[in-house]
């Protein structure tokens, strides 16, 4: 019951921010996406830590094909955004189009200099801890901004529309598949790191969305 109330409180917050100043929310979304891009390209990609979502899937595909993660994310997101425009409608797609464009651009941009930051943090535990907190902060701000980064969220919305599976459950299924793919390719240790990051970051998201209490 408590989780049910928290979920609906999150939804009400997201609906509320949709009515607030577009450009202020856009600035916060951009800053949060920039932070996510730095952490993703500096720590997650080099260490092959798959935490789900399109960014996690990109690490898996990179291992299989050798393509850069930024290129994979750009291609997959573009395809999903186009599909969402026709399937989900223009009204639902507009925030996804804007958000996905900024997010993928910043993922590509941060990948150009993130390698120069890798030497500043070499302790494995600190890498996981910093990644957990930073990703939680970034995602929390992204959710509060009312924008959508695209990726697996689009796929979940499409599955929800046609198969009537709750979006949260769709996301769980998709992310579980991606994380298990990472476990198969990179081993159980990397998967434990990913689960730790997801657990801590989800707590950070709750703090940003709902407050300390």
Residues covered by each model-derived region:
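Core subunits and conserved enzymes of cellular information-processing
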Residues: 2-213
């Amino acid at each position: 019951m408590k989780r049910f109330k928290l979920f609906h409180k999150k939804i009400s917050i997201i609906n509320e921010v949709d009515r607030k100043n577009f450009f202020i929310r856009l600035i916060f979304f951009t800053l949060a996406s920039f932070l996510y891009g730095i952490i993703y390209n500096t720590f997650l990609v080099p260490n092959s830590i798959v935490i789900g979502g399109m960014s996690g899937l990109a690490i898996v595909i990179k291992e299989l094909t050798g393509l850069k993660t930024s290129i994979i994310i750009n291609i997959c997101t573009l395809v999903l955004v186009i599909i969402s425009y026709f399937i989900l409608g223009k009204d639902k797609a507009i925030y996804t189009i804007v958000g996905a464009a900024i997010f993928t651009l910043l993922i590509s941009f941060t990948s150009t200099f993130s390698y120069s930051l890798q030497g500043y943090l070499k302790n494995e535990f600190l890498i996981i801890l910093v990644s957990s907190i930073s990703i939680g902060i970034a995602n929390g701000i992204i959710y509060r901004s009312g924008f959508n980064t695209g990726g697996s969220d689009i796929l979940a919305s499409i599955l929800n529309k046609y198969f009537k599976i709750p979006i949260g459950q769709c996301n769980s299924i998709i992310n579980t598949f991606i994380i298990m793919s990472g476990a198969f390719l990179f081993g159980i240790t990397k998967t434990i790191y990913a689960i730790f990051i997801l657990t801590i970051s989800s707590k950070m998201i709750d703090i940003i969305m709902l407050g300390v209490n």
